Structures are given as C-alpha cells and as structure tokens.
Amino acid sequence: MISTVVWGTGNVGRAAIRAVTAHPGLELSAVLVSNPAKVGRDAGELAGLDTVLGVAATDDIAAVLAAGPRAVVYAASGDIRPDDALADIVRAVGAGAVVVTPALYPLYDQRNAPAEMREPVLKAVAEGGGSLFVSGIDPGWGNDVLPLLMTGLGSTVDVVRCQEIFDYTTYDQPDSVRWLVGMGQPMDYEPPMLAPGIPTMVWGGQIRLIARGLGVEVEEIREVVERRPLETTVETELMGKFEAGGQGAIRFEVQGIVDGRARIVIEHVTRIHASCATDWPLPHSGAGAHRVIIEGNPRIEVTIQATAEGGNHSAGGNATAVGRLAGAIPWLTTAEPGLYDALDVPLPFGTLDRSHP
C-alpha cells in the first residue's frame, strides 16, 4: 500500500479523501488542514462519510512530511494563493513525495511553463527525489486524454472543441464565484478570471497538450469573452442572493490557431442560474456537463455528466478530477522522479473490487 496524504479538505479535498480511501493500492496516512476548527476531526467526517477512518486531521505540515509519505494529493486551492500553493508543493516534492494536484495551472503543460514555476519544482525533484503531476481542470481529462482519444476514432479531424457547461447554483465557493468569475457583480466589474491573458494562462497549456498529441504546432492562442446580466434576482442555497442586473453568465473560448484557423478550442459556458443566457449551449440534462466535439469525418460528439454527494454535478466533476490524480499515483511511484503532464501519465483502468465510501 502506498502511504498517501490528502492536503486540504475543501470541495476537492473531500473528494480526494474518498478517492484515496477507495483505491486498493493507496492508504490514507494523514490529512492536512489549515482551519484550526478542523484539527483533530476524523477524515471520514471531513469527507462527509458515514465511516470513521481513524485518521485525525492535523495542521503540522513538518511532522506529516517528516513521516515520509510516498504520495500527496494536494487539494488546497491555488486560485487565490498560487505562490503559497507552489511553495507547499515544492516542499512536499522536496521531501521525496509524489505529488498530484490540480492547483498550478501553468504546469498543466509543464514543458512550456514559466521558469519561475518550473525551476523550483525541478530543483525539488533533483534534491528530494519526488515527482509532480498537475491535472484536474475541466476536470483533468476533458481537455486532454478524452479529446485525443476521440480524434483516433475518425478518418479526418478538422476542429477539436472541448466544452464545460455549468450552472453554479449548487457551488459552495462564494469567493471564487463572486470575485474571480464575477457572478452577481456589476457588468462594469472586470472579473480577474476573464482579464486579458488569464484564460490563456489557465487553459492555454491544455491547448498545447492537445496540439502536441496531434503532432501540430499552435501559431497563437486567442481569447473570446462574452458576458450576460441576470434579468431577475435569483437565490442560491449555498451562496445567497444574486441581484438582477449583475453578471449572470459568461461564455469564453480559448482558441488554438493552427493554419490560421481556430482548430483547437476550449469553451466555457457558465451560469449562476439556468434562466440566464438560455440561447447559449446547455447541458442535455441536469446542471452541467463536459462535452467534446470532433468536427471531421465522422463528426463525433461525446457528453459526460458526473454526479456525487447526492446528485451534485460540481461534486461529480471534482470526483473525476481526483480519480484521475489518485489513479496516477501507483504509476508515478514506479517512474523516475520528475515533472509530468497528462500526455506522460497513462490513464489506468478502474477495478471492480474497490470499496465505495
């Protein structure tokens, strides 16, 4: 069994505890938290399980890493604290652990990552013997292994389009939803996530990963952004009220230009309520979906909807993201220490003999 730490117990961390506990080759050895109110609580309780796992949460990072865990699922947010997240991850890699995380967007395409992100990790790899694999947005397969798999099913490929379509009504991330994405803010508010260059920073690496898999070069990456206001005030269960006139939906594309055309596209359509921007793409059912469309011969379209925690689509997306990460740990522990991306790490098959916490 591979001793595995889950670092962070938010939306992704809860799913990570479940994934590690269910995996037949992993053993949950510790759970790290930053909130003093969570210290001492059982990991099963923090993950919303009915099972006591016998692992008490701690905030003692030094002690956990000194115990020599073989792997760390870093589930703490990097959206609003990227420097801190990088420092945490470098520390774990330097302690010799295999680290898997969705937190560092620039490292999704690690070969082209900025030096200030890449070099500290490589230094930690060289000194400590750990490894790092970053994946998990949209939700870690929708913009890399899935579209590339689908391109292999056709005779010709003209355009690859990856869509995430979500209604944030059920989300429990008010800071990210209101301030990073701008939901409910006045229409003259400039959401940081939509600032020029930020979509490319977050999703450009996945454009380049798909291009690398297809054996083509991306000439440039373009961004297209649209926003719509709410026509009526709406109330959400977990994040409160969003007033009419404030931002209610966004739609953006990150376009990989090949031969002068947008041929690799990552598109997001996000609403705070299903009543907003109904003329934009919608999921076939439910609150959200990930969709990949291959324009070519034949035209191929695949829509995937995942649910967890009582039918919650956002929780389902998180569960598949950490499923990919946790599933990569056994392979990473046998590979050479290094910095890996989604095209390096094989996607293992699941097993039928797992428990279901």
Residue ranges and their predicted role:
Residues W7, N11, A15, D84-A87, ...:
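Conserved active-site and cofactor/substrate-binding residues in soluble primary-metabolism enzymes
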Residues D83-A87, A95, A103-G130:
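Rossmann-fold NAD(P)-binding glycine/threonine-rich loop
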Residues S34-P36, G78, A103-L107, I137-D138, ...:
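Short, ordered loop/turn segments at secondary-structure junctions
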Residues W7, T151-D279, H290-V292, A315:
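Active-site-lining helix/loop region of Rossmann-like oxidoreductase modules
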Residues M1-A95, G215, G317:
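N-terminal glycine-/serine-/threonine-rich beta1-alpha1-beta2 phosphate-ribose binding loop
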Residues G140-L153:
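Alpha-helical support elements that line or immediately flank enzyme active sites
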Residues T101-P102, L132-S135, R161-C162:
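General beta-strand structural signal in soluble alpha/beta enzymes
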Residues T236-P357:
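C-terminal active-site/capping subdomain that shapes the small-molecule cofactor and substrate pocket
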